[in-house]
């Protein structure tokens, strides 16, 4: 079994930072100033072993979702999709209509399945009301 935990800002951020580092995030992607006001989702085993994490933060009239990280031993499982679904679900409660996802190429297909269109080298955009929720969970 696993559990998912929401946090805001740097509350319990040390484990998210450690997960990003262990998942192979580039040094400048471990932590930045946006983490202080972002919403974070953290997924772990019941034992506390980290599995995946992601964050979401406001940027003007849009919400940004980025830093989706999955531990290498869990990457073949659909935890990246689970994290993205949780972030998108929470986005439905927020006032921003546009959602932008910033990700690396390994997540492009996943993001497209939710109806996001590429709008930059590593950026995808979709309005909150146009999200495709019936994408299949695939490994």
Regions found by a protein language model. Name each.
Residues 122-139:
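C-terminal "cap" of GNAT-fold acetyltransferases
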Residues 42, 49-57, 62-69:
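Conserved beta-strand in the GNAT
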Residues 105-122:
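Conserved active-site alpha-helix within GNAT-family acetyltransferase domains
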Residues 70, 76-89, 103:
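Conserved acetyl-CoA-binding loop-helix of GNAT-fold acetyltransferases
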Residues 36-37, 50:
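Short, basic and Ser/Thr-rich N-terminal targeting/leader segments
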Residues 1-31, 40-47, 136-139:
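Short amphipathic alpha-helix that is part of the acyltransferase structural core
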Residues 91-104:
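Conserved GNAT acetyl-CoA-binding A-motif
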Residues 58-66, 75-76, 119-125:
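A conserved beta-turn-beta hairpin within the catalytic core of GNAT-like acetyltransferases
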